[in-house]
Amino acid sequence: MRAPRHLIHLILLILITGCTTVVNRVQLDRELGRPDPGRFDRPAAPPAEAPDYQTRVRPILERRCVACHACYDAPCQLKLTRHDGITRGANAESIYAGTRLLSASPNRLGFDAHSNAAWRDKGFHPVLNERAATPQANREASVLYRILALKQRNPGPDSGPLPGGRFDFSIDRPQTCTRIEGMPDFEKEHPDWGMPFGLPALSTAEHDILSRWIEAGAPFTPRPPLSAALRARLAEWEALLNGDSLRDQLA
């Protein structure tokens, strides 16, 4: 019995796609070195030219990205509210799967894995470069950089309705969580799917800040310590809200 033609075409497409991904991975390994999942577990001092994460990068992410990428069920489980959420990366597994009969292992930041290497073992793939620490590699091997650049090349309309048939905003839509090896094909097949998805592109200034930050290795800078006056004020509120008296409990 001969297989249906459409089934043969589907099998060939899967084989070709898989071969292309392998070829792209080998090329990346040859040109930029093999990935090191522990790269961001060993934070280095940020270069002087890198935009500061707390004061320049995080405000852009909060303003333009976290409306979608904040919760644990964010698209591709990519949490952009925290630096360790960015370095953890993406995972195509759906959090709320209606057909799942058994419970799934949770993926809570700070609880269920404590290194990026451990997150890789749980199925997460990087969206930042984990290969050679050079500006070129930080651009070419970063899903985040390339998907932001894709939006800059194909910004779409700033207002009015979007082109019909190009975007799917349904809650149960299939997730497309492309690894870096698949980005060349993704960029060709879905030129309109840059980030922010279905929304106006980042401004030139915003994109420049994020691009320079990624090129510099996406360094993290901790929050500055609280002042003594603010710590004292917080202690007063903690004492008030956690008091044992009936009056304190009523408050």
Regions found by a protein language model. Give the residues of each.
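Positively charged n-region of N-terminal signal peptides that target proteins for export
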Residues: 1-6
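Bacterial N-terminal signal peptides
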Residues: 8-18
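Aromatic- and Gly/Pro-enriched helix-to-coil junctions and flexible linker segments
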Residues: 19-251
